[in-house]
Regions:
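Conserved nucleotide-sugar donor-binding catalytic segment
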Residues: 1-52
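Short, surface-exposed acidic
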Residues: 76-81, 126-127
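Amphipathic alpha-helical repeat scaffolds of TPR domains
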Residues: 83-98
Length: 163
C-alpha cells in the first residue's frame, strides 16, 4: 500500500525503509530474531566517520526521500506525526553533522539546502522539525557554529562510542 521503493545502489536506506511505510502501519509486532549480525569495528564499514563523510550524498538522498514521505500534520494520528518528525529531525541532524565534518564549503551549502528543502516541502513540517533541540543545535551559524558541532561530535563519539 505504501509504494515503498528503495533507491538503488545506496547505503543508509534503513532510515527510509523504517520510516516511509509508517502511515500505513496498523500494528507492530516485535520479534526477537537475529536476522543478521552487525560486526562493529571492521575496517570500511558504512557507519565509520570517514566512510559516512565520503558517502554523504547518499545520506542526503535518503533525507530527501524521508522529507517527501513525511505526512502533513492532521493527516495521521498526532503520536505518529510526532514520531515521524522526531525521526526526521534525527536523520536530518545526522546528515548535517557529516556535511559539516567534511570541512567542504560545498557541503556547508548542501547542509543549508537540506534544511531549506524541508521548509520548502512543507512550512509546517519544517517548523516542527526545526523546533527539536537537536535541529536547533545543528543549525548554529558560521564557522563558530561548525566548530562547536565538530567538537560536540568528538565528545559524543567518546561518550557513546559510535565507531
Amino acid at each position: 500500500d505504501s509504494g515503498l521503493q528503495l533507491p538503488e545502489h545506496t547505503f543508509y536506506v534503513d532510515f527510509y525503509y523504517s520510516y516511509q511505510p509508517f502511515p500505513w502501519v496498523k500494528r507492530i509486532q516485535y520479534l526477537d530474531v537475529p536476522f543478521y549480525h552487525y560486526f562493529i569495528g571492521r575496517e570500511g564499514q558504512s557507519v565509520q566517520t570517514d566512510v559516512m563523510i565520503r558517502r554523504v550524498a547518499q545520506l542526503r538522498l535518503v533525507n530527501q526521500r524521508m522529507v517527501e514521505a513525511t505526512p502533513e500534520p492532521g493527516t495521521v494520528p498526532d503520536g505518529l506525526y510526532r514520531y515521524m518528525i522526531h525521526f526526521l529531525a534525527i536523520e536530518s541532524s545526522v546528515t548535517s553533522v557529516f556535511l559539516i565534518l567534511s570541512k567542504d564549503k560545498a557541503n556547508y551549502r548542501l547542509k543549508d539546502e537540506l534544511w531549506a528543502d524541508i521548509d520548502k516541502a512543507s512550512p509546517a513540517i519544517g517548523r516542527d522539525v526545526r523546533r527539536k533541540l537537536v535541529s536547533r543545535a545543528l543549525n548554529l551559524r558560521g564557522s563558530v557554529g561548525r566548530w562547536v558541532i565538530r567538537r560536540g561530535y568528538v565528545v559524543a563519539e567518546k561518550v557513546v562510542g559510535f565507531n
